[in-house]
Amino acid sequence: MFFKAGTRRALQKVGLQKCSKRLYHPTVLPSLISTTSPEFISKKEAMDDLIEELDAKTAKARLGGGATAQERMRSRGKLLPRERLALLLDPHTPFLELSSLAAEDVYSDYIPGAGLITGIGRVSGRECMVIVNDATVKGGSYYPLTVKKQLRAQEIAREHGLPCVYIVESGGAALPHQANVFPDREHFGRIFYNMAQMSALGIPQISSIHGISVAGGAYVPALADENVIVQNQGRIFLAGPPLVKAATGEEIDDESLGGGMMHSTESGVTDALARDDNEAIIRVRGIIGDLGQAGYRGVLPEEKVEGPVYSAEELHGIVGTDVRQPFDMRDVISRVVDGSRFREFKKDYGSSIVTGFAHIHGYPVGIIGNNGILFSPSALKATQFILLCSQRQIPLLFLVNVAGYMVGSKAEKGGIAKDGAKMVRAVACADVPKLTVIVGGSFGAGNYGMAGRAYSPRFLWMWPNAKIGVMGSGQLSQVMTSVSKDPSQHATLKSEIEHQSTALYSTARLWDDGIIKPTDTRDVVGLGLALASRRPSSGNQSRTGRSTTWDGNGMGFGVFRM
């Protein structure tokens, strides 16, 4: 996850209309944090070390398949995948990369970034979803997580009306993994289904072919609204020369079978022939520049935006890396929102959850943050706040650090199950964009009530210290003690659960959209809100800007069990 210069200016240009001026002046949140205390310094050092470790992993992943593979690509006169990306994007504009550590330590082979670069950036003045095959990683083959990463990018593009740009160079499915790549609903074929569906919705699909595009991969350029192919470099065919010979006896070279000249002059599969990578990318920029203003419009933030009163660097010492250590979520909010101003809702009721209104980079947002375990009053308060934001069409930001809902006879008699269900239902049915940042723990049903992945937030990011699981390893150890008397089994399971709960484990499996630094939270969320402000300029939606599941279209909230 990284940003180029000009983030503030770029956020202002995402939309085309101005927000109405806010008429109130929320209170600046106070801060009692001592940045010289031993506790603060200890937490900060631990967080700094963790971020340094993740930075090293991210830097390695961005090298793709390594120096040898890169040199092989250069020797063929090709630009590297990230060089193509840099040439495509407008200079000095932010690029929000998604899931850069996908597939980290998942497969026996090293598959950095799952062999795919995805992210949101500006092309010819227009925000686009960019999907780049990294042919330095196993020839750009599709592993199960490669497919999952591309489908997630398409999901984000569809929700926000972002044109998709596919920079293609791929050998297709990784055959040893074909059982988990090819046949099911959310496998390889879904990529092409999504392209067809988005094109039908008026969301442009543009591709540029820089190398081989074989078998199912041939349908990426074939299904694109408009495409470009590089001469003597791009190849599009359903079956390569060896398979053609085996099937038909015909002997033919790959250029004659599926090269750029043939497809541009005879088959008509491609629309433009480029001399090299540079020209192909320039042509794609021209295509995006000619899309016009059809599709989606946005809302500009307020012209005058205050930065937070307090330094974002202090977040490292406030939160630390141990999710068992409590902190006040207001100290996080005050280092993220404009002017550190926050109009808190129901401050004295349900105090284990913090709710209120703020602005981030000028965009209005309703914030729900945890300050401990969720009790019935906390759940009811959050439910009411979600209903308010839904009614007022204010996006929701969930700042998550939750151990779950309260348990025990008193809680059960008090109706924690039905009250928690109200909150979960409200989150599921809220018809406004939801953004989630896990800043600490996200355990048990608390994950559901705080807009976990299953509840279709527009984006879900994790801080490096974040943990996610059915329960914490300490709680699990206590449960195991009651059901098993083998101490060695307890230790092994606790270690395994601890490992599987980390942010790195999560992001490698695409349970989130990437790990972000605490100091980047304001800008990342600001870009998310800017994208969420985009609304269809036409269509049959009765309420524009509403958020639905990928394949759901439910309206309203259903029945709350009182």
Task: Please provide the spans of the model-predicted regions.
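N-terminal mitochondrial targeting presequence
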Residues: 1-28
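Ligand-binding clefts of soluble mixed alpha/beta catalytic domains
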Residues: 24-562
